[in-house]
């Protein structure tokens, strides 16, 4: 009887140890964000910041390290080729606003990233690949010209005066000769603006880009 009790105790201890050691599949990384946004387009900072959360059923699980990889394509990231940044294994519990530290990022280009974490109960696998798009990084990259009335609305009106029309509808027809893989629109307006493509509105923004003192600063989306 004593031997049976000892054997049962050993079995229970082994089962308990198995339950306390999570596998890499049970440690998942979720809610990956760049500049606190999900797969954003139009990031205009040279060193974007990454954030993520750890999801696991195991109690008392805390992050002890992370590793981030960034590439110009999802394919390069999968095979770890032509990486623009590989942070290496960093011993840190930081999971918010980790700044990009790789090669210089180009304006108007898409990038792809992933992260895996190390915890006090083991390491996880690579997260799903996420993406973000860079915007215009300096004034020299803005090539567009203002469109609207060619002259002041009323004789003698000053530049900062009100215009005659409360709202304007401007149309620009164009054709593309090649298959479109990716297209990004940068739009700015003095006041609220909405954009439609082939009759369909392309965003749900309200009062975009945003109010400002137009004689000194104009935002864009």
Specify the residue positions occupied by each region the protein language model found.
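Recognizes extended acidic, P/S/T-rich segments that occur
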Residues: 61-110, 120-126, 142-151
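Beta-strand-rich ligand-recognition modules
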Residues: 97-104, 197-221
